[in-house]
Each structure stands twice: as C-alpha cells, then as structure tokens.
Amino acid sequence: AGIRYLRMKEAAFYNGKVGEASGMCVPFLERTNFFGDAVYDVTYALDYGLFAIGEHVERLFAGARRVGIEPPLARCELIEQVRKVVRMCDTGDLMVYMQFSGGAGRREHVRRTEAGVWIYCFPKKIEDPDKKYKLITAPDIRYGLCGVKTINLLPNVLAANAADSVGADECILCAGEIVNECAHSNVSILKEGQLVASPARGKILDGISMRRLIAACSELGVAVSRRTFTLEELKGADEVIVTSSGVPCTAAERVDGIRVGGRDGRTLARLKDMLYRQFRLACAMDRG
C-alpha cells in the first residue's frame, strides 16, 4: 500500500535522519572521515524484496563485534529501518548498503562516542547471468582484516580502477602465486567436475554468495574442495566463477587477456540457473 507514496531516486538514512542521498549531511567529525572507522555490508533488492537480509545483517553485526563497534540498535530494528528506506525509493531494484561507524566526535584514536548507523539505497540491478567477465590480476596489498568488511578499501579501489582502465570487469588479488579473491567479489574454479574455493580466512571474505554457490553444489551433486589454489590452476580451470552480492554466479572468459574456461558449460549452467532462481525466490518471499 505504501508504494504509491515513493518519491526518492536514492534514499539514505543517518542516525535517525532520512532523505535523498545527495542532500544528506553527515557530521564533519564522523570517524569515517578521519580513520575509516566503520564496517559495512551490502545486499540487493528485487522489486522491493530484500535478498538474504538476515545473513547480511548477521555478518554486519559480526564485523562490528570484531572491531569493537557496539551497534546502537538490535538486528531486527536495523532490518525494519532498512525496509523503510527501501520503500522510499521510486524503483524496487536496488543496491542496499548498511554501515556502522565509530560515531562522531573530536579526532582522537580512542572511541568515546555512540556508533553511527548508515543506510543507502540506490537503483542497481544484479548482473546479467549471461555476461562473461574479463579479469586482470594484481598483487594483494591489503591489510590483515580482509575477512571483515571494513571501509578501508583504498587497495580495492586501486585494483578496481586498474581493471576498469583496461576494459576489465574485476581484478584478482594474488599473494604471490596464490589466488585470494577479487577487488569486490569472490572467485572460484571448476576443474574436472569439482568446485575449488579458497577457505574463508583472514585474507578472504566469507562471501554470502559464495556460501550459496557451495550449497548449490551440494544440492546438485557437485563436489567441493575448500583449499587454496594458484593462478596457474585458475588459468587452466574448466570454468572460472565470480560471485558477489550483485553477481550470484557468472563466468570469466579472460584473465590478463588470456582466454580461460569455457570447458564445463553444463555444470556452470546448472549452478547459475539454481542460484538466479533462488535469488528471485528469496526476494519474492521477502516481499510477502
């Protein structure tokens, strides 16, 4: 019933204030400005239905706990507020961004303020399932809390811009010859009918879409090996798979200009079909 009153292209929330994102004001003394002192999470909405909102909020709270930020509201209260902001947008296909910051106060390293709550929703569709990604590689120069979604993303920004500058879609971050993950996605491979995915550890985010890819493999009878793998293995894989909140499952066709994958389209198609169907169903169920 509330949809008829929608009015914002991009809606935002900050500590109780709601408005068009372009007009929202955040205090100069916000700790995000000086220290990058915040954790975040991202999900998507399809026709106003949220995808896996419980899992994303749980990961956001877990990240806050890891860095000592105490959220000023409960999980259910955050989800309720996210739904309100989503409903303020004039389209229902959205990226939904949530963040807890260290709050606003005098610039000093020790936190002495209540945490800040940020929500930002803007129009964005999930990736076309038929798109084939072009990837590049770069050394992983990030710091040691990669398993926590903090906003200290300068190395990721540099990697993503390096990819964009040569017409690529993503950048694979490598520690020597070991593949970690992409600048803003997880990457895994199919080899001889088996999915090989790096274990969630300090240098790799525990991706929710990766979890769902692994669950889909289990349902479809595809074996899974959680182990590290090399760039050489990736380039020789039957398929290279990229996943993120907005990319339930897509294949890469080139890495550093070299053609990759394309040898197990049947397994890839089965996984992709299941994951996109699950995404649409989850959003429809969330709409009620």
Can you annotate each of these PLM segments?
Residues I3-K84, H109-G288:
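Helix-start/capping segments and mature chain N-termini
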Residues C76-R106:
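Short, acidic/charged, Gly/Pro-enriched secondary-structure junctions
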